[in-house]
A protein has these predicted regions:
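Bacterial Sec-dependent N-terminal signal peptides
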Residues: 1-25
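Alpha-helical protein-protein interaction scaffolds
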Residues: 64-153
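Hydrophobic transmembrane signal anchors and adjacent membrane-proximal interface regions, especially
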Residues: 3, 19, 28, 138-140, ...
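N-terminal secretory-pathway/extracellular module detecting exported/lumenal segments
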Residues: 108, 159, 182-184
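Long, positively charged binding patches that form subdomain-scale interaction surfaces
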Residues: 141-179
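Short, flexible active-site-proximal loops enriched in glycine and acidic residues
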Residues: 14, 114-118, 156-160
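N-terminal alpha-helical interaction modules that lie
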Residues: 20-103, 164-232
């Protein structure tokens, strides 16, 4: 069953999809990002704080947003195997929404830009708000905070490419690929997935009004780096 943001957050605005023609594509310069992470990690931490603030910082450039999100992967684990992240799906599937929200907040305390934790926090609140049989101490405005932050990250990923072979979307984890496809581009059905060179290629069974091509490319340089580091 598709769990779209618009369905679950019936009081919230739908995701802000930026038309490709309206923005410049800015590929991630991994060498530069890693250099900043090693030589000036506080700069990335400051940018992460700005990107994850409750109120959007309209002075941030796209380059700063990119440095914040992708640079964070060098400072903290923000993939789908990090501490506490693995528990989120289990708690959500068991409909333990209060516990899921609490677990998501713990992940976000370490990495405020974890897409998976933001998704679970937002959806947990959405389910609790809609549940008329229980009184939960949460409000739709709290869910909006997580929703807004998630949307900023999606827009940041969207700025790095257009999904083509020439301009793939850059990600730091496989989980981010599926989060981006489902909750930003409304792409749910895939035929197969395979990797070549530095890209994951996903063949789609169906397209959406946000993405009309049958193939979508994700640049996975950082994903491969992290996998290799697990075996070193």
């Amino acid at each position: 069953m598709r769990q779209t943001i618009a369905f679950l957050f019936f009081l919230l605005m739908p995701l802000t999809i930026q038309a490709q023609a309206e923005r410049e594509i800015i590929p991630v310069d991994w060498k530069e990002v890693k250099k900043v992470a090693e030589q000036d990690p506080q700069r990335i931490k400051d940018l992460v704080a700005r990107l994850s603030a409750n109120k959007i910082d309209t002075t941030m450039t796209w380059q700063e947003r990119i440095l914040a999100f992708y640079g964070q992967s060098y400072l903290e684990s923000n993939d789908d195997t990090g501490e506490g992240v693995m528990d989120l799906d289990k708690l959500m599937n068991e409909k333990k929404y209060e516990e899921c929200l609490s677990a998501a907040k713990k992940v976000l305390n370490k990495n405020p830009l974890s897409l998976k934790a933001l998704r679970h926090a937002a959806f947990s609140i959405g389910y609790m708000v809609k549940d008329s049989t229980h009184h939960y101490d949460v409000t739709i405005s709290e869910g909006q905070v997580y929703y807004n932050r998630m949307n900023r990250i999606f827009n940041t990923i969207a700025t790095t490419g257009d999904g083509s072979k020439e301009h793939p979307f850059y990600v730091t984890s496989v989980s981010d690929e599926y989060m981006f496809m489902r909750y930003y581009l409304d792409l749910w059905e895939i035929s197969k997935q395979y990797a070549t060179d530095n890209c994951d290629i996903i063949e789609l069974k169906e397209t959406s009004k946000y993405y009309s091509q049958k193939l979508i490319y994700f640049e996975i340089t950082r994903v491969m780096e992290r996998w290799k580091s697990m075996f070193e």
